[in-house]
Every structure is written in structure tokens, then in C-alpha cells.
């Protein structure tokens, strides 16, 4: 995620929180195309649990992206009501949180998606789910979550402002945004 964010010159600061330093070291060594950019001066690396990292942070972030694995083992804390409440507090008044929501394709996973959305909805006044087709994910059909204190992902979309940036992206377009 950080690799993509550093492409935008207006991004001033990125805090990357990873529980496993060895994972990052292995990626740097064997998958440099994935780990590239981590030396960018705008990036600060923290090796910590995401929930513990966010506790006590208030009004600090414009955007929180949770690109966690499944809610198993050491990442379970990133799928709790406490975590989403901590994200809410850590975001500025106009901040946005986006996160992996999983695949609703299989019955058990679909139930987890619903459970997760209910937890987020209890913390954020605006909480929506969007979809993408990602062939490398189980079932190829994946959901993501959008949560905000202020912005609705469709009603507040400023397509003209985005288009005026002239940003060339591989996947995202404002039409796709509306359709997802």
C-alpha cells in the first residue's frame, strides 16, 4: 500500500505498522519490487500490533488503510469493535478508513463480512462496502470497507477534482468508483 501512496506528491506522511519485522526484511530481500519505496523519507515504519499502535491516538490521521490478513491469530485485534473505535478517534474530523472486508462468496465468510460491517457501523456514522474482482483472492470476488465521520463515498465524490489532478492509475477511475 505504501508503495502506491508514495506515487502521490501531495502525501506528506505515511506510518506503516507491521507486526512482523522479519516479514518486511524478507520482502525487502526477495521481493524488492513489492517492498520498494520503504526508504522514502515520508514513510515511518513501526513494528507493533495495529490496535496497540492506535490506542491513545487522537485526531492524527487523514486516512487509515487496514490491509490486514484474515481475522485469525495475531491479527484478531484488528477486527474488533475496540480497533474500529480506535481508528475513529485517531482520524481527523474529515478522515477516512478503508479496509479489507473479505469475500462474501462462501457462507462462513459472508457471515464474517456481515459481522465486521456491524462493528464498523457502530463506530462510524458513515460505513459502506464496495467490491472489486481480484483473481488472486479466494473466489475472485472481494469486498472492501469505507468508513468516515463526514464523507459519503458517492454523495461526496468530487470527480472533477480527482480528474483535474491528471493522475494516471492502473485500475481506479471515477466511473469504477461509482460502480463499485
Locate each region found by the language model.
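The AdoMet/dcAdoMet-binding core of the Class I SAM-like
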Residues: 1-94, 106-113
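Alpha-helical structural signal in soluble globular domains
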Residues: 4, 8, 119-123, 149
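Residue-level detector of family-conserved "landmark" positions at structurally sensitive sites
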Residues: 16, 38, 101, 129-130
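Active-site-proximal loop/turn and secondary-structure-junction residues that shape catalytic pockets
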Residues: 70, 103, 133
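Conserved Class I S-adenosyl-L-methionine
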Residues: 84-88, 110-133, 145
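Conserved beta-strand signature within the Rossmann-like core of class I S-adenosyl-L-methionine
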Residues: 94-101
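Soluble small-group transferase modules, centered on the S-adenosyl donor enzyme superfamily
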Residues: 126-180
